[in-house]
């Protein structure tokens, strides 16, 4: 897109291999892609090769989150160590394939009291220190438990290697539509742009089934307001969209996407991406 690069996240639900997705993203008009790494180093290598072949930007590698909660819990020291080492390995992959950013969650868990600990800050500090040594930026993403995100960013966002990944959908369905760009937009380095229907439960109980990853403009997001918020941060780097063509369990909001041929769905993703980007840049 003129004066704005657009990126789409690969997705195991798209029905073709991630390297093939890179080719299809290019054909649809996107400039870049990212990959969720869950221990499959060969997947990252194959996507990097596809990116080189099709002249696509490898925007980021998304780290796993299975040890994120343990990294805050002194009673789970062995798993906390595993979490730190897992993040370090993901950083190594970024170095190996010239990927500038690792996206990382800082917590995962529902139905509990969110209390950041010094133990957690110390563990994430080890990851941050390693990223700094390796020349990789970490984009910490908003998920459930913004208390943990705030704790990590307040401790480390003064460092050049630390920034914020804003997930517009998580903000609506996990963070009660708090304006997190107002809080951390000064270090915005990555985006996961998507839509949803907010929190389904009347009493405000959050759950991952609400994290629909609809195309922008298909949910309740106020996209004029969101565009103005992004614009206010001054962020001019590649915009990443994280979208899903499959519905969550016992939900049907994404079914219409799954009924489309993948090429048609990706074309619609690109249309929505351009529409939102133009609202930021006008």
Name these PLM-found stretches.
Residues 13, 240-262:
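A short, acidic, flexible beta-alpha connecting loop/helix-capping segment that sits on the rim
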Residues 1-89, 95, 132, 150, ...:
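N-terminal pre-domain/capping segments
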Residues 4-10, 33-35, 58-63, 102-104, ...:
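Hydrophobic faces of well-ordered beta-strands that scaffold small-molecule active sites
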Residues 218-232:
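A short, acidic, amphipathic alpha-helical segment used as a generic capping/interface helix at domain edges
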Residues 11-17, 34-46, 109-114, 143-148, ...:
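Acidic-and-aromatic substrate-binding clefts and catalytic sites of carbohydrate-active enzymes
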Residues 53, 73-163, 260:
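Active-site acidic/histidine proton-transfer and metal-coordination neighborhood
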């Amino acid at each position: 897109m003129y004066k704005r690069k657009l990126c789409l996240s690969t997705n195991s639900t798209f029905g073709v291999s991630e390297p093939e997705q890179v080719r299809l993203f290019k054909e649809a008009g996107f400039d870049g892609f990212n990959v969720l790494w869950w221990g499959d180093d060969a997947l990252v290598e194959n996507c990097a090769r596809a990116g080189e072949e099709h002249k696509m930007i490898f925007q980021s590698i998304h780290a796993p989150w299975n040890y994120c909660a343990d990294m805050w819990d002194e009673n789970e020291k062995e798993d906390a160590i595993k979490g730190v080492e897992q993040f370090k390995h993901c950083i190594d992959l970024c170095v190996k394939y010239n990927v500038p950013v690792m996206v990382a969650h800082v917590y995962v868990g529902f139905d509990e009291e969110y209390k950041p600990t010094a133990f957690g800050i110390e563990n994430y500090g080890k990851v941050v220190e390693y990223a700094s040594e390796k020349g990789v930026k970490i984009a910490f993403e908003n998920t459930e438990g913004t208390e943990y995100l705030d704790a990590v960013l307040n401790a480390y966002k003064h460092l050049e290697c630390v920034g914020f990944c804003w997930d517009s959908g998580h903000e609506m369905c996990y963070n009660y539509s708090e304006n997190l760009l107002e809080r951390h937009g000064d270090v915005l380095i990555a985006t996961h742009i998507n839509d949803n229907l907010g929190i389904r439960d009347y009493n405000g109980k959050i759950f991952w089934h609400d994290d629909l990853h609809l195309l922008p403009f298909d949910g309740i997001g106020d996209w004029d307001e969101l565009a103005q918020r992004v614009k206010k941060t001054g962020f001019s780097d590649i915009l990443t969209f994280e979208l899903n063509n499959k519905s969550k369990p016992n939900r049907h909001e994404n079914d219409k996407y799954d009924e489309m041929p993948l090429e048609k769905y990706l074309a619609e993703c690109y249309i929505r991406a351009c529409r939102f980007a133009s609202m930021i840049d006008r």
